[in-house]
Amino acid sequence: MRFKTKGRTLLDLKIKKAHIPKSFVFTIKQFRNNPKLIIKKIQKKFTKEIIVRSSAVNEDGNKKSFAGFFDSVLNLNSQSFSDVFNAVNKVESSYKKHYSNKNEILIQDMLIDVNISGVITTCDLKNYSPYYVINFTKENDTTVVTSGKKNSENL
C-alpha cells in the first residue's frame, strides 16, 4: 500500500463522503516559489479562523509514523497575510531533518466546539499487534492526543 500525505488522504476521504473540514493543500516548493499567490488563494477560500497543519511525505507509512511529530498552528486569522506566512514557515521548519520540497502544508477551517477528537492507528504501539487502536479525548482541545500533554482514552 502506498501512503499519501495527510492532506492528500483527507482530500480523498472527503471525495468518499467523510466529513472533513474545508481543506487546501500545497507543497513547500509551491509556497517558496510564490507565497503571495498561495496566501491569496487561502484568503479567498477561507473566511474564518484556520489551522495550518503539517502534511509531510514521510508522516505516515508502513514502517514509521510521525503523527504528532511536526508542528501545527491553531486559531489563525485567515485574512492576516503575516499570520499565515509565519505559520507556514513555523510548520515547514518543524520538518527539520525530514525536509523535502515535496512536503506539503495542509490548511483547514479551525474546528470549534469539538465533542471528541483523536488519532487512529492500525497497530498497537506498545506491542505492534495488528489491530485498530483509537486514542481519543472528549475535551474541546484538539491537541490533547497528539501533544501528549494529558492522558487520552483508548478504544
State each model region's role.
Residues M1-L155:
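Nucleotide/phosphate-binding sheet-loop regions of phosphoryl- and nucleotidyl-transfer enzymes
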